[in-house]
Amino acid sequence: MAQRLPVLYNKKPCYDIVFQQSFDGLWEELAELGAADKRLCIVTDSTVDGLYAAQILKFLEGKCRKAVKYVFPAGEEHKNLDTVRDVYRFLIEEGFDRKDMLLALGGGVCGDLTGFVAATYLRGIDFVQIPTTLLAQADSSIGGKTGVDFDSYKNMVGAFKMPRLVYMNLSVLKTLEERQFYSGFAEVMKSALIKDAPFYEWLIENMYEICERDLNTLEEMVIRTCSIKKIVVEKDPTEQGDRALLNLGHTIGHAIEKYKNFELYHGECVALGTVAAAYISWKKEMLSMEEFYEIRDMFVPFYLPISVDDIDPQEILKLTKSDKKMEAGTIKFILLKKIGKAVIDRTVTDEEILAAIEEINFSEEDAHE
């Protein structure tokens, strides 16, 4: 039987996160949303298309008014307004109206882009998240943040749009490419660090089972991660306060991601950004030295970087200034008071940021000397 997490919006039921180990229950969930009387469009990328789109289209055949798919080229570089325009055009040509529905089948890029289309097409159309990466299941598919990149600004154009459903087939994690899998773990780790010290300890205790991708262990891990995010976004759905805590590692992480022209995965950059944030927390005497090194080294068994070559600290600093989390010219930095407790800090100086960037700006061999 599927496990479910109901998510509230303004203290009222909004949507369910459904955890399954196959796609077999998807139509039943869609039918509950009135999908039989709707046109459905699967929006997916060129990588995920060949893996799951045909299977899901087969489930939909003959059960709804119309089932089509739109495939865009895979990669962060295609998460932009040009792709959004192409999806708009496709939906218009296929006759989609405000009563129809989009299905975001893929990772974080697909969910962000599809959600933004759903928020803006005809002033709003329903959409469902079907995340197929650990990063999307653990983080980006939940909470209603949607958006695309604009020039050098990541997620600069966006909207809050809650999905009608988040359907997670956890079995896809078994076959996920290794680097993609571990990239997603950075968001799992982030969730534990900001809100749940016992979960952090659980991750350490279950390290082997996670790396072996034991399905029951992965299910518990994803459910616990989603539970943390659910609590945070229910209290602060539009990021006016504590929802910003979910941005641990993202200020410097986004800057590195852009500087490296998206050669590094998002989760890899979040890991680097989290190490940098933990370093600043140590230097501000929030964390002990031992806690900093423990956090840093926790990423290593999960094949996540704790240092990066060939970055210009001044350029990274400059890119942090274009971060959308700036407020009145000040960066809202997320720091750690201890493992399991994060805080918003507006006092981080350029010198502290540069020192943190220097800390991660060397070879991994040097990091263990």
Task: Show the residue positions of the predicted features.
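Solvent-exposed alpha-helices and their adjacent loops that cap or buttress functional pockets
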Residues: 10, 34, 95-97, 120-121, ...
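C-terminal charged capping/lid subdomain of soluble metabolic enzymes
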Residues: 3-4, 188, 286-369
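Active-site segments that bind and position negatively charged phosphate/pyrophosphate groups
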Residues: 201, 206-314
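A glycine/threonine-rich phosphate-anchoring loop and its flanking beta-alpha core
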Residues: 10, 116-209
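ATP/NTP phosphate-donor binding region
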Residues: 1-101
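Short glycine/serine/threonine-rich phosphate/pyrophosphate-binding segments
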Residues: 109-116, 137, 255
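Non-catalytic interfacial helical region
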Residues: 88-105, 114-129
